[in-house]
Regions:
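Short, low-complexity intrinsically disordered segments enriched in A/P/G/S/L with frequent Arg
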Residues: 3-4
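N-terminal leader/targeting signatures
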Residues: 7-13, 24
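Short, Lys/Arg-enriched N-terminal segments with co-localized hydrophobic residues
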Residues: 19-40
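Bacterial N-terminal signal peptides that target proteins for export
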Residues: 39-53
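Bacterial N-terminal signal peptides
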Residues: 52-62
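Sec/Tat signal peptide C-region and signal peptidase I cleavage site
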Residues: 63-70
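Beta-strand-enriched cores of mature, soluble protein domains
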Residues: 73-288
Length: 288
């Protein structure tokens, strides 16, 4: 008579980037624990077998037929827009080069103003989405990603329910989850451009005012393809803040003459899928 053995297999994934919960689950910026019982007939599992199961589940989930079909049904998307970014670092921000921030932490904000865009059949024209974050003390952006002090995303309150859901989804691509949890707020997001000065207001919480600086040979300095570049940061123009303030997440920032960046971009889901796959490989190679 066959004897039945059961083993409880516990899988724990620590992920650094929240990308797509169907296509690339390896890269979530959350910790998820899933438990199930495996029925083993007439025998026991060796340590090697247990390790093999864990690796197979960690690396192979995304290729299951059911999940592949679900991924194929995800809406395609495309966004043309402008990036406004500022942080507490001195210009240019060293964090994009895997270096330590200029101060103990990097207190940063980035806001995307969508000129034209869609998520599936949902138009995103004229909407905006932003993020405020803070890295841990004395650690680089790269080594600490996923364990930042906080991660707050602000969604344009002009968006209807469908647009809000779309912007929430896109925020996981534009702003990979930097902390263990993420807060969402729906607020007015506005921008004013007067001459060289760009001013962004994010509800009652954040204010960013900055301008481009002059390069030695004329025109603003351009940073191209830094080590941590992503599709909206493939290249950007370098500037300096006039003022960066933030009052939320138990913070009270007041910075002047710090890092400011500006860029125009045109991205879509295919560009991000390629980028996110490359980032997952880089993280794996780093042993993180």
């Amino acid at each position: 008579m066959e004897r039945e053995y059961y083993i409880e297999v516990r899988f724990r994934f620590s992920r650094l980037f929240n990308i797509d919960r169907v296509v690339r689950p390896i890269t979530f910026a959350i910790e998820m624990t899933q438990t199930r019982k495996e029925k083993i007939m007439k025998g026991t599992l060796s340590n090697t077998t247990v390790v093999s199961i864990a690796i197979a589940c960690a690396l192979g989930v995304s290729v299951l037929p059911g999940r592949a079909a679900e991924a194929a049904s995800k809406p395609s998307w495309k966004v043309t827009g402008e990036l406004e970014e500022a942080c507490s670092c001195r210009a240019a921000c060293p964090c994009w080069f895997k270096s330590l921030p200029s101060r103990m932490t990097c207190d940063g904000a980035q806001v995307i103003f969508i000129t034209k865009g869609h998520y599936g059949k949902t138009s995103l024209d004229g909407l905006a989405v932003g993020q405020f974050v803070q890295s841990p003390e004395h650690k680089s952006m790269f080594e600490s990603f996923g364990n930042w002090n906080f991660d707050y995303v602000y969604i344009d309150d002009k968006a209807n329910e469908e647009q809000r859901a779309a912007l929430k989804h896109l925020s996981d691509h534009f702003f990979p989850r930097a902390a263990k949890s993420r807060e969402f707020r729906f607020v007015p997001i506005n921008r004013k451009i007067e001459g060289a000065e760009h001013t962004c207001t994010i509800g009652e919480y954040g204010f960013v005012s900055g301008h481009l600086i002059e390069g030695g040979l004329g025109g603003p300095p351009k940073v191209v393809n830094p080590p941590l570049a992503d599709p909206t940061h493939k290249q950007f123009l370098q500037g300096q803040t006039t003022r960066l303030t933030y009052k939320d997440a138990a913070q009270d920032w007041k910075y002047e003459n710090s890092n400011y960046m500006y860029n125009k971009f045109d991205v879509d889901n295919k560009v991000y899928e390629k980028h996110e796959a490359a980032m997952a490989k880089m993280i794996k190679a780093q042993g993180m």
